């Protein structure tokens, strides 16, 4: 009678599984087919046994055996190969931590500044670590120094040139526009000076010695003419400045003379007024008291005669 194999499914070794795969039909145990019970599972009594053709009798109630229904291939230990392989297969899952990454063009100005600052700090830290290890360092690849040089001179072109408001706001906008216009003018002047110097240097390098001497003499002649013209203009400016001063002095003297003459005439007028009043007072005393005037009678509206009084007309 064949011995009964009591083997657990969880204790099947990989060597036994591989041997079961290779051997295939050489030692494939036959599985006993149990009757299908659609109404419910039938429990076999503890003493009942299942007969197998090769292995003999196996107790039905033993928990260590793997009893699989259907025609599936089992390992010599009694467990299926597919179940073991499925249990040992490693399945990778995506990380639960999601990186909130956005393109550089979609970032705001503050976010761009923060990202650039982080990258510069990281680059500086890496360079320090490499320098500490004694490794050769390449120059830091950046063009920020060029942008800093240009930002000092370039004006702000994003300012809207609209009508200025009244009050302090208008004054502030006027001051800002004046400052921006001045900065823009200085930038254009410096740019023109640099371009002119570069062009002049290139033109001088391409000239011969005789041409340079001739240009030098021409420049000396122009310099002497400019100095003479400057002296002449200064002399004219001095004369023109002296003439208004003389005119002002003459006008001041004329005003003073007229003021003195006016004061003298006022005094004479007051004196004549005093003398005229004194003569009027002495004339009635020499001629005597005047006779009273006789008022002529007049006729009233009622036909009666009357006399005018001193206050009547």
Swiss-Prot record:
Gene Ontology molecular-function annotations: 7SK snRNA binding; cyclin-dependent protein serine/threonine kinase inhibitor activity; identical protein binding
Region (Disordered): 1-78, 111-139, 155-194, 267-313
Positions in coiled-coil regions: 207-276
Keyword Nucleus: yes
Domain of life of the source: Eukaryota
Modification Phosphoserine, positions: 28, 52, 75, 80
Notes on the domains: The coiled-coil domain mediates oligomerization.
InterPro entries xrefs: HEXIM (IPR024872)
GO CC terms, sorted: cytosol; nuclear speck
Function: Transcriptional regulator which functions as a general RNA polymerase II transcription inhibitor. Core component of the 7SK RNP complex: in cooperation with 7SK snRNA sequesters P-TEFb in a large inactive 7SK snRNP complex preventing RNA polymerase II phosphorylation and subsequent transcriptional elongation.
Keywords linked to the UniProt accession: Coiled coil, Nucleus, Phosphoprotein, Repressor, Transcription, Transcription regulation
Subunit structure: Homooligomer and heterooligomer with HEXIM1; probably dimeric. Core component of the 7SK RNP complex, at least composed of 7SK RNA, LARP7, MEPCE, HEXIM1 (or HEXIM2) and P-TEFb (composed of CDK9 and CCNT1/cyclin-T1). Interacts with CCNT2.
Localization annotation: Nucleus
Designated name of the protein: Protein HEXIM2
Bias-annotated ranges (Polar residues): 1-13, 64-77
Gene that specifies this protein: Hexim2
Species name: Mus musculus (Mouse)
GO BP terms, alphabetized: negative regulation of G2/M transition of mitotic cell cycle; negative regulation of transcription by RNA polymerase II
Stretch list, region Interaction with CCNT1, HEXIM1 and HEXIM2: 225-286
Major localization listed first in the record, in broad terms: nucleus
Compositionally biased tracts (Basic and acidic residues): 112-131, 179-194
Span list, region Interaction with P-TEFb: 139-142
Family: Belongs to the HEXIM family.
